[in-house]
From Swiss-Prot:
GO terms for biological process: translation. HAMAP family: Ribosomal_bL9. It comes from Beijerinckia indica subsp. indica (strain ATCC 9039 / DSM 1715 / NCIMB 8712). GO terms for molecular function: rRNA binding; structural constituent of ribosome. The keyword rRNA-binding applies. This is Large ribosomal subunit protein bL9. Belongs to the bacterial ribosomal protein bL9 family. It comes from the Bacteria.
Length: 189
């Protein structure tokens, strides 16, 4: 299906481009989201008549996103979660959690703007991209910790005591070697 893009779409094109996309992508994402119009003759004429208005609206949105991006770029958000001794979270931190932390800090960020490919499942400092506009993207740091004290220590760069996972195979070999050195085995008793 040929569509006319009403805004810049990543890996597809800029506003005003006529591109060919799969029918499902157009019907389920581009058309309902107001990102494109079907490329019919009537829509082409309508788009050309509205082009100046759409460009000014897009420029205003980009300027607003750039202003928010200047304040948001480099910010650190602390999220407190329960985690095991190895640093693995008992759940995960999703884009919604990061957006809620940003909103609590006074930033207007929607969860769809958080470009997290997979949920975060470990404690520590994590860089997360935030796409405020197709042309404006910034990075924020998410500090995931078990307590506020631990979050402060992580922010200062101190090492957090995380118990390393024990490899049971290596442990068995070490016990076997110790028994061999002692001249006995487990079956001697």
């Amino acid at each position: 299906m040929d569509v006319i893009l009403l805004e810049r779409v990543a890996k597809l094109g800029h506003m005003g481009d006529i591109v060919r996309v799969k029918n499902g992508y157009a019907r389920n994402f581009l058309l309902p989201g107001g990102k494109a119009l079907r490329a019919t003759e009537a829509n082409k004429k309508h788009f050309e008549s509205q082009r100046a208005h759409l460009e000014t609206r897009n420029q205003e949105l980009r300027d607003q996103a750039a202003a928010i991006g200047e304040k948001l770029d480099g910010q650190t958000f602390v999220i407190i979660r329960q985690a095991g001794e190895t640093g693995q979270l008992y759940g995960s931190v999703s884009p919604r959690d990061i957006a809620e932390a940003a909103i609590a800090a006074g930033f207007d960020v929607h969860r769809n703007q958080i470009a997290l490919t997979t949920p975060i499942k470990t404690i520590g400092l994590h860089e997360v991209p935030v796409v405020l506009h197709p042309e404006v993207s910034v990075n924020v740091t998410v500090n995931i910790a078990r307590s506020p004290v631990e979050a402060e220590r992580q922010a200062k760069g101190e090492e957090i005591n995380v118990v390393e996972e024990t490899n049971l195979d290596e442990l068995g070999l070490e016990i076997g070697a110790a028994l061999a050195d002692a001249g006995g085995s487990l079956g001697d008793r």
